[in-house]
Amino acid sequence: MDKVAEIWGTVPQYGQWALAGIGALYVATRVGAFLQLLLNAFILSGTNLRKYGKKGTWAVITGASDGLGKEFAQQLASKGFNLVLVSRTQSKLDVLARELELRWDGFKAKTFAMDFSKDDDSDYERLAELIKGLDIGILINNVGQSHSIPVPFLQTDRDELQNIVTINCLGTLKTTKVVAPILAQRKKGLILTMGSFAGVMPTPYLATYSGSKAFLQHWSSALSAELKDQGVDVHLVVSYLVTTAMSKIRRTSLLIPNPKQFVRAALGKVGLNSSEPFPNTYTPWWSHAVFKWVVENTVGAYSYFTLRLNKNMHIDIRNRALRKAAREAKKQ
């Protein structure tokens, strides 16, 4: 401390004032960002979805038959939107569509079964034909795949690697290429794409999934600037763990909401992006947002410390998954 004081004493007074001012400004911006985060999480409401269309306007949802996609369908239907439900299994889509038709008077649904991992251009052509003439106001890019368990990149199954990139990246881009022209033509629309903490913080043992979500982060932010002047709002929705089949987590906690809680927040906080480092990105669930802010403003999302911590955590998850699989194999 004496050495620091000695060095500080050699700085001219105007320099001391300048350095103190810079430090105070930095602290003020950090405090302001955190206060904005709290306002976004607990007080402010996002853009009213009626901006994107009156009752009976259509929304397109990918990965619609399970988890977050199914919950997006249920909540958008409750808000008066008709739905184009896109997922792999026709029977699940039929059940969901029928359930929503019975629950909401006047509700309409169209279903389209496609396997995004096939990357079949004819599927996208048929999807374009299905939605032709519909007044579409919202696109939810929810379809996605992760690794079955955390796995070293060099041990990743080739099909799993390809499916993750094809579904998460190409599936999202090609669906958006089909739907976005309709939104741009009507001069108003919303595109929500599901992101992940794995796209914000490089995640060892989920390297391919992490990279695919980082790709979506930059693509979505870039697209938001391109479509803004055409009246289309584009946002990336960042999530941590949610109790879904993909996460394999069943119990909720302070840091882990269920799909209903998360989707309610996602639809209720659209456009509240000011506390995020990336343009047109938001973390709707409050504890996710606080956790993310703390990491980014202390150790850093890209720091060696965070990378090492993430690696050790996923090694532990992998080991537990392998032990569980071994126990189940012995029972057979």
From Swiss-Prot:
Transmembrane segments annotated in the record for this chain: 15-35
EC number: 1.1.1.330
UniProt keywords, alphabetically: Endoplasmic reticulum, Fatty acid biosynthesis, Fatty acid metabolism, Lipid biosynthesis, Lipid metabolism, Membrane, NADP, Oxidoreductase, Transmembrane, Transmembrane helix
Catalytic activity: a very-long-chain (3R)-3-hydroxyacyl-CoA + NADP(+) = a very-long-chain 3-oxoacyl-CoA + NADPH + H(+)
Residues forming the catalytic site: 209 (proton donor), 213 (lowers pka of active site tyr)
GO cellular component: endoplasmic reticulum; endoplasmic reticulum membrane
GO biological process, one term: fatty acid elongation
Compartment list: Endoplasmic reticulum membrane
InterPro entries: 3_ketoreductase_fungal, NAD(P)-bd_dom_sf, Sc_DH/Rdtase_CS, SDR_fam
UniProt pathway annotation: Lipid metabolism; fatty acid biosynthesis
Protein name, entry field: Very-long-chain 3-oxoacyl-CoA reductase
